[in-house]
């Protein structure tokens, strides 16, 4: 299986995901629980892997992360300050 990478990374949101999660005072487990309420099947280990840049993020996961964390996708992807 081919590993997908962009500039050596599996995802481009890992740094800002941590910032947004911590700004909302959420643990990885709490974030996973909020995502599961939106029917996104993601657990604490998956959140950890995303934050450690060891897992890709699907488009629907990105949109749900934005919804739960109240941020724009462009910000999460590093386009906006």
Residue spans of the language-model regions?
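Short basic helix-loop element that most often maps to the first helix and adjoining turn
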Residues: 15-37
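Recognition helix of helix-turn-helix/homeodomain-like DNA-binding domains
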Residues: 37-57
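Residue-level signal for the short linker/turn that defines the boundary of a DNA-recognition helix
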Residues: 12-15, 25-26, 42, 57-60
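Conserved hydrophobic/aromatic packing and binding residues within compact polymer-binding modules
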Residues: 17, 31-32, 47-50, 76
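Short amphipathic recognition helices of helix-turn-helix/homeodomain-type DNA-binding modules
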Residues: 75-81
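DNA major-groove recognition helix of helix-turn-helix/homeodomain DNA-binding modules
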Residues: 54-75
């Amino acid at each position: 299986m081919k590993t997908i990478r962009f500039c050596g990374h599996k995802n481009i949101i890992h740094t800002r995901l941590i910032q947004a999660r911590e700004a909302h005072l959420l643990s990885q487990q709490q974030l996973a629980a909020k995502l599961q309420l939106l029917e996104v099947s993601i657990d604490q280990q998956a959140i950890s892997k995303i934050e450690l840049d060891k897992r890709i993020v699907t488009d629907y996961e990105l949109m749900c992360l934005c919804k739960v964390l109240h941020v724009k996708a462009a910000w999460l992807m590093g386009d906006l300050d």
